[in-house]
Amino acid sequence: MHEFRTTPSNASVPRKHRLLIGEANPALRDYLLAVLGADGHEVVAMASGTDLMDTLAVSLHPEFGSGRFDLVISDARMLGAEEARVVRKFEDHAEVPPFVFTTVFRDKDLQAKAKSFGALAVLEKPLDIDDLRKIVNSSLHHLTEDRGQLVAGATG
């Protein structure tokens, strides 16, 4: 398994979110690691769809609770399957993180299908890093709010 990691560049900033990236292109994978890591996220990147799926599956087990991912960003075709199949594989797990798919195909059907299976977005390559950051930040902001409401509800 080829795993690439980055941790927040400022060690005094506590880790808030973990991102799992699936990207076969080494240059794009390194770029995403650098940019999202510099934004303060812990990023784990995989070079193959098999490794991505295995890493995600392991992270969903209760004994690895601290290792769960908050968001998955993956090339839809790198997984060797339709993105819907990937999402379906994990639909029985309540803790599956949201997915953002990337693709070189400008296919409206692909986008509609991915969104119908729960993907937050389908971004076309070449990626606009500002668009990706907006989606990541928005998704993680909502996740943080939801967790805060759960904690407040449990204590109140």
Task: Annotate the PLM regions.
Residues 101-102:
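Hydrophobic/aromatic residues positioned on beta-strands within the core alpha/beta folds
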Residues 39, 95, 116-118:
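Short, structured coil segments at secondary-structure junctions
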Residues 125:
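A Lys-centered signature of the CheY-like receiver
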Residues 1-42, 50, 57-70, 88-92, ...:
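Non-catalytic signal-transmission and effector/linker regions of two-component phosphorelay proteins
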Residues 85, 105-121:
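Alpha4 helix (beta4-alpha4-beta5 surface) of REC/receiver domains from two-component response regulators
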